[in-house]
């Protein structure tokens, strides 16, 4: 399956952002209700 490496962009709408790492997720910041700067990040 295709997966996204840590630090790569993700769309912010898939909970796991199809990250290659099991404990990673799609981290975004919201700007006026829009998701921006989404990237694959490791959960804490």
UniProtKB/Swiss-Prot annotation:
Gene Ontology CC annotation, any one:
extracellular region
What job does the chain carry out?
Omega-agatoxins are antagonists of voltage-sensitive calcium channels (Cav). Toxic to mice by intracerebroventricular injection.
Describe the family membership recorded for this protein in Swiss-Prot or TrEMBL: Belongs to the neurotoxin 04 (omega-agtx) family. 03 (type II/III omega-agtx) subfamily.
| Keywords, sorted A to Z | Calcium channel impairing toxin, Disulfide bond, Ion channel impairing toxin, Knottin, Neurotoxin, Secreted, Toxin, Voltage-gated calcium channel impairing toxin
| Keyword RNA-binding recorded | no
Q: What is this protein called?
A: U17-ctenitoxin-Co1a
Q: Which InterPro entries match?
A: Omega-agatoxin_II/III_CS, Toxin_34
- Give expression by tissue: Expressed by the venom gland.
Q: Which organism is it from?
A: Ctenus ornatus
Q: What is known of its domains?
A: The presence of a 'disulfide through disulfide knot' structurally defines this protein as a knottin.
This entry's Gene Ontology molecular function terms read: calcium channel regulator activity; toxin activity
Q: What is its main location?
A: secreted
Keyword Secreted listed? yes
* Disulphide bridges, residue numbers: 3-20, 10-26, 19-40, 28-38
Compartments in which it is found: Secreted
């Amino acid at each position: 399956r295709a997966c996204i490496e840590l630090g790569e962009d993700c769309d912010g709408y898939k909970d796991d952002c199809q990250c290659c790492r099991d404990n990673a997720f799609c981290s975004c910041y919201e700007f006026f209700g829009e998701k921006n700067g989404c990237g694959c990040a490791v959960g804490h």
